[in-house]
Amino acid sequence: MLTMAMLHDAQRVLSGVINRTPVIPSTGITDECRLFLKADCLQKTGAFKLRGAYYKIATLSDEEKARGVIACSAGNHAQGVAFAARDMGIHAVICIPQGAPLSKIEATRSYGAEVVLVPGVYDDAYAEAIRLRDEKGYTFIHPFDDYSIMAGQGTIGLEILQQLPDVDMIVTAIGGGGLISGVAKAVKELKPSCQVIGVQAEGAASMYE
């Protein structure tokens, strides 16, 4: 179960490790409300995924860390896991679809991870990561379906409430559900009146459908 204690612990663990990213006023999108952007594009590795990956790996047992970690990703989760593993001295293997952007692949390698390029799409990379986990004994770091991942991503919600106490609506991507789950937990526990709206692209609206 995802708890507020986990979110607060994640914020404690991540303090001094990740960037506390700013909320930036936006004047170019709409003039019908006061709009702010939570700029996690300024996060180390360039995306919020570092938050969940780092907290998940930090809370593994010594035995789980010693086995090394494995993940599958086409980009941002890969870099988050690689960064966190390097920071903690843990071997990381990342399965990436061959069609992923070269910049993402090279960035993952630059953080010291062993990259396995897998023919096909994301589902093929996921299957290969599970196969290697079972064969080699690695600890699998899921990109979203994990309470520790959600807690790490949810620190965005805590930060927004601390930076914008009067916020009355937060709009966030849904994706696999890790980010919005963590943000919604933080916001609805601490400020129930604030709306949390999830959005998806029409062409990939799996949660909506």
Label for each model-derived stretch:
Residues 1-209:
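PLP-dependent amino-acid enzyme catalytic core
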